[in-house]
């Protein structure tokens, strides 16, 4: 169920009336759902642009159309239009399921490691154009990783591995006892910091 505040409905209605298109509504969809970069998208929806499988939410003077593929990701979402302390107004969408839900402890060790890598570690590495991929997780809890992007060949990869990736995985995933790097860093084409770097 998606909750829309009265102030958000009034805001949407004002925008729709400004467009002056009969039957126009608002379409809500999830962009890149289940990933760290997931976001909610709101846009005007002319009746002729609708696919036909959207879920309809009657908002009184207009309809909110929810893309059918986005329904599960947007379940429990709240849309509000609030006045900030500064006096400015802002549309706020809270969609707690849009980025996916953290796996429970009953998930396998591999699933939990992959979830933390994709949802916590890779978003941080992306700021340097890097990423890491899980190559293997042994039954004993040793994780074998391969760095890519700006991390492939980076002079700080060892520090990133020990102080960032390994520390995070060991704190967040019960059962991980060590993390190893399987990357051949000598083949890195565009490292964030060259391995020849000396401060």
From Swiss-Prot:
Cofactor note: Binds 1 [4Fe-4S] cluster per subunit. The cluster is presumably bound at the interface of two monomers.
Keywords, comma-separated and alphabetical: 4Fe-4S, Iron, Iron-sulfur, Metal-binding
Binding-site residues for [4Fe-4S] cluster, renumbered to this chain: 151, 154
GO molecular function: 4 iron, 4 sulfur cluster binding; iron ion binding
Residue ranges of coiled coil: none
Cofactor(s) this protein cannot do without: [4Fe-4S] cluster
Domain of life: Bacteria
Pfam families cross-referenced by the UniProt entry: NifU
GO biological process, one term: protein maturation
Keyword Metal-binding: yes
Subunit structure: Homodimer.
Record family assignment: Belongs to the NfuA family.
Function text: Involved in iron-sulfur cluster biogenesis. Binds a 4Fe-4S cluster, can transfer this cluster to apoproteins, and thereby intervenes in the maturation of Fe/S proteins. Could also act as a scaffold/chaperone for damaged Fe/S proteins.
Name of the protein in question: Fe/S biogenesis protein NfuA
Organism, as annotated: Xylella fastidiosa (strain M12)
Organism lineage string: Bacteria, Pseudomonadati, Pseudomonadota, Gammaproteobacteria, Lysobacterales
């Amino acid at each position: 169920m998606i909750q829309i505040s009265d102030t958000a409905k009034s805001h949407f209605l004002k925008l729709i009336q400004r467009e002056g298109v009969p039957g126009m509504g608002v379409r809500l969809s999830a962009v890149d759902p289940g990933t760290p970069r997931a976001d909610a998208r709101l846009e005007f929806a002319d009746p002729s642009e609708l696919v036909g499988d959207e879920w309809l939410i009657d908002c009184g003077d207009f309809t909110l159309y929810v893309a059918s593929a986005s329904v599960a990701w947007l379940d429990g979402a709240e849309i509000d239009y609030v006045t900030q302390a500064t006096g400015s107004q802002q549309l706020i969408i809270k969609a707690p399921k849009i980025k996916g839900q953290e796996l429970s402890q009953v998930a396998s060790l591999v699933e939990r490691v992959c979830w933390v890598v994709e949802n916590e570690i890779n978003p941080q590495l992306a700021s340097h154009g890097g990423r890491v991929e899980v190559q293997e997780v042994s039954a004993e809890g040793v994780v074998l990783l391969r760095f890519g992007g700006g991390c492939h060949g980076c002079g700080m990869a060892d520090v990133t591995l020990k102080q960032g990736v390994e520390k995070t995985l060991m704190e967040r995933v019960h059962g991980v006892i060590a993390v190893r790097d399987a990357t051949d860093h000598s083949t890195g084409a565009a490292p964030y910091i060259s391995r020849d770097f000396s401060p």
